């Protein structure tokens, strides 16, 4: 399954297949839960009144802060990229319960909230691309487009979207209980990073639907996120 849903890379210009302007849109498709490793979880958690689980983790983002400043790149963009990269290596991120069905995707997107020209906020889905330069180009183009048009950019019909919210001006540890009964997507939230003498840390909360993944998968993702931050390079 992991091979069939892995993000494919374009052979030209080192761009990801799904980021290439001439790539074919791949939509989500329904799959039989009984034919997946999530069969038991689907049966146990789909009708649960509160199927969401929240984990907290304190990340060392010292390298990310330095990388951002040295290369003139936005910290939030780099966080979104590392989140997408870590998630793309875990097959459970290509599944999502939607309504009463289990859907499978071939790509991942990372959502970010954008302050728009009307003084409100809009939602912007960013297609994950392994190429950091391409992801940055998409980030700058799409967030600017959304900010000016005040129109959400939605990829939920073609990609499994990881929601994020960065409250970078505020000192918070995370959030729990964000379940509307409509959206089951995994969601991350963080506030201001904290500086000390030796490192800079950022506490994040990660909420996920128990049908989609178990605690071990979520923990592996968060550990993977730290590794992606530590190994980030152009």
Specify the residue positions occupied by each region the protein language model found.
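Short, positively charged and aromatic/hydrophobic N-terminal segments
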Residues: 11, 17-18, 24
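Short amphipathic alpha-helices and their capping loops
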Residues: 25-48, 109-115
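Histidine-centered acyl-transfer/condensation active-site motif
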Residues: 157-171, 186-223
């Amino acid at each position: 399954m992991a091979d069939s849903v892995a993000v494919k890379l374009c052979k030209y210009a080192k761009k990801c297949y799904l980021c290439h302007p001439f790539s074919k849109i791949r939509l989500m498709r329904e799959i039989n839960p009984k034919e997946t490793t999530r069969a038991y979880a689907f049966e146990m958690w789909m009708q649960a009144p509160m199927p969401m689980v929240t984990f907290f983790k304190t990340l060392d983002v010292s390298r990310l802060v330095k990388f951002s400043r040295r290369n003139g790149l936005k910290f939030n963009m780099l966080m979104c990229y590392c989140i997408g990269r870590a998630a793309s290596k875990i097959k459970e991120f290509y599944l999502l319960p939607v309504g009463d069905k289990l859907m499978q995707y071939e790509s991942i997107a990372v959502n970010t909230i954008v302050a728009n020209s009307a003084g409100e906020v809009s939602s912007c889905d960013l297609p994950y691309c392994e190429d950091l330069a391409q992801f940055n180009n998409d980030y700058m183009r799409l967030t600017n487009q959304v900010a000016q048009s005040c129109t959400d950019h939605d990829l939920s019909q073609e990609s499994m979207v990881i929601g994020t919210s960065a409250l970078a001006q505020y000192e918070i540890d995370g959030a729990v209980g964000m379940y509307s009964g409509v959206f089951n997507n995994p969601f991350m939230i963080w506030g201001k990073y904290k500086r000390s003498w030796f490192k800079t840390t950022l506490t994040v909360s990660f909420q996920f639907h128990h049908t989609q993944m178990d605690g071990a998968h979520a923990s592996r993702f968060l550990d993977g996120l730290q590794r992606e931050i530590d190994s980030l390079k152009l």
